[in-house]
């Protein structure tokens, strides 16, 4: 049986300021760096065959903390990147609500219907990431 552990990156400087980041490169905050180290320690007694991350720096930095503890390398799979929020990236909740009234509520209540302005749909995100996970599982290297 294959067991997959999905880990979210540590807090970023945009998380701190309430900004949407998606596919934009945003650094981990001081707290996020500490969270990455604590997450790595959670894996101390767990055997891992591999560590896979998206290419976003915040995800890589978090994954590298686990890899360092396990003396392993991190494999990069671009398809695992976060949703591309398009025009929303870098904006706060308030800025988005001002520019696109009602869209945030729509995102939380009917994400399957939402197409982000100049961004990715949740259906596209799902297709991309599910395909990547299937490929990882099906390659047979445990």
Regions found by a protein language model. Give the residues of each.
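Extreme N-terminal starter segment of soluble prokaryotic enzymes
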Residues: 1-5, 50
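Active-site-adjacent alpha-helix immediately C-terminal to a catalytic or transition-state-stabilizing loop
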Residues: 1, 13, 60, 68-69, ...
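Histidine-centered catalytic micro-motifs
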Residues: 6-10
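Phosphate-coordination/substrate-recognition cap region in phosphate-metabolizing enzymes
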Residues: 37-104
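Short, basic/glycine-rich phosphate-binding loops at helix/coil junctions
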Residues: 16-19, 102-114
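Loop-to-helix element that buttresses phosphate recognition and phosphoryl-transfer chemistry
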Residues: 11-65, 115-130
């Amino acid at each position: 049986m294959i067991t997959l552990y999905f880990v979210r990156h540590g807090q970023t400087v945009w998380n701190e300021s309430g900004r949407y980041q998606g596919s934009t490169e945003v650094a981990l905050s001081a707290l996020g760096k500490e969270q990455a180290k604590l997450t790595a320690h959670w894996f101390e007694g767990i055997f891992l065959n591999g560590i896979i991350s998206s290419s976003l720096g915040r995800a890589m930095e978090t994954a590298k903390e686990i890899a360092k503890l396990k003396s392993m390398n991190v494999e990069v799979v671009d398809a695992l990147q976060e949703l591309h929020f398009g025009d929303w990236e870098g904006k706060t909740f308030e800025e988005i609500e001002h520019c696109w009234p009602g869209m945030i509520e729509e995102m939380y209540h009917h994400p399957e219907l939402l197409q982000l302005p100049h961004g990715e749909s949740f259906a596209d995100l799902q297709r991309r990431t599910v395909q990547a996970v299937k490929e990882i599982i099906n390659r047979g290297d445990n």
